[in-house]
């Protein structure tokens, strides 16, 4: 399900409106690697603050500056162009001196830190991100304030944001054409975008179905449960439901939904039947990820922002700060606050 307007809300549909990203400075993201660089090694880590530049462009410019092939430059995650973001780039430079990045002239970018590390920085190898958002032109301060309290206590649906689906949902449209052999997709990046969009749409559809049935916080027989903050999961057995529900209520466990691929969903019994029914209509996308041998995975149904705080600048503008684990979308938090908000599209 790619249309966010069709997805169910956890706290009911918001009534307030407002704007996000009126300026790049209203959307600030600071990467949290979750570890300290070693200080030595064959990898050069460069922390960059950028505005108006996407991640791939900066990687290309760093490769050119350091006289390296693009494949020698990596990063932990893609960051929005329409924002102020701080992220690390990794340059593989064994036996080479560290370049003097103070001479790098790249509009919209500042090098904040340079160090060495022993291991390559790969996609997903970060703990999370710190966000500072400013919502402007808020129509109802009282409602947004009440929703901020609810979100801090009860979280939000862990939906993939519209960025995942491309401009006007183009990634999904192309994925369906590819699945039906109406187009050929040779570029590796595009294949990855289309497959990710397909799995994300199916995940969103299952999460929305659980919310619609008021089962986002109810353990079903056969549910795939995850220890909070961990990636591994286990299946809920019939004789353990009461104990597992208590652990879920205490915040020790989280219910997961599928990122379908070439393999079983992972759930059993009632939960499996629920997910299969929820995925009705997604046979084309499901067949694509199976055909392309994408590995099945699971992802938490709900997202709990950490270190959440907010301050009103005036009656129509509020600054909201929070931390999210890697792979989560800040716009999924905003979606529970505002009925509609201005946002920037991300395409392939």
From Swiss-Prot:
Keyword list, A-Z: Isomerase, tRNA processing
Residue ranges the record marks as coiled coil: none
UniProt EC number: 5.4.99.27
Catalytic activity: uridine(13) in tRNA = pseudouridine(13) in tRNA
Cellular component terms per the entry's GO annotation: cytosol
Gene3D superfamilies: TruD, catalytic domain, TruD, insertion domain
PANTHER family: TRNA PSEUDOURIDINE SYNTHASE D (PTHR47811:SF1)
Summary of the function given for this chain in its UniProt record: Responsible for synthesis of pseudouridine from uracil-13 in transfer RNAs.
Family: Belongs to the pseudouridine synthase TruD family.
Protein name per Swiss-Prot or TrEMBL: tRNA pseudouridine synthase D
Gene name in the database record: truD
């Amino acid at each position: 399900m790619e249309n966010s307007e069709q997805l169910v809300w956890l706290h009911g549909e918001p009534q307030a409106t407002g704007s996000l990203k009126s300026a790049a400075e209203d959307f600030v993201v600071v990467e949290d690697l979750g570890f300290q660089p070693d200080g030595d090694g064959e990898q050069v880590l460069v922390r960059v603050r950028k505005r108006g530049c996407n991640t791939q462009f900066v990687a290309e410019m760093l490769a050119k500056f350091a006289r390296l092939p693009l494949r020698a430059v990596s990063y932990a995650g893609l960051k929005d162009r329409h924002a102020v973001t701080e992220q690390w780039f990794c340059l593989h430079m064994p036996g080479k001196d560290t370049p003097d990045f103070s001479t790098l002239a790249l509009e919209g970018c500042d090098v904040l830190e340079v160090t060495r590390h022993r291991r390559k920085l790969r996609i997903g190898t970060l703990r999370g991100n710190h966000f500072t958002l400013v919502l402007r032109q808020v129509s109802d301060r009282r409602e947004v304030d009440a929703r901020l309290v609810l979100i801090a206590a009860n979280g939000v649906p862990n939906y993939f944001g519209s960025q995942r689906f491309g401009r006007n949902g183009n990634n999904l449209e192309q994925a369906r054409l590819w699945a039906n052999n109406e187009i050929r997709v040779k570029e590796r990046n595009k294949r990855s975008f289309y497959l990710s969009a397909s799995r994300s749409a199916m995940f969103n559809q299952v999460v929305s179905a659980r919310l619609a049935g008021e089962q986002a916080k109810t353990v079903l027989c056969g549910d795939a449960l995850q220890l909070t903050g961990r990636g591994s999961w286990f299946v809920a057995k019939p004789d353990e439901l009461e104990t597992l529900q208590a652990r879920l209520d205490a915040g020790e466990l989280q219910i997961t939904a599928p990122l379908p691929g070439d393999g079983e969903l992972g759930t059993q019994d009632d939960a499996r039947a629920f997910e299969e029914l929820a995925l009705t209509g997604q046979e084309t996308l499901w067949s694509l990820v199976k055909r392309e041998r994408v590995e099945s995975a699971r992802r938490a149904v709900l997202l709990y922002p950490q270190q959440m705080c907010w301050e009103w600048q005036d009656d129509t503008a509020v600054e909201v700060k929070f931390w999210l684990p890697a792979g989560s979308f800040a716009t999924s938090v905003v979606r529970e606050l505002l009925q509609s908000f201005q946002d920037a599209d991300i395409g392939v």
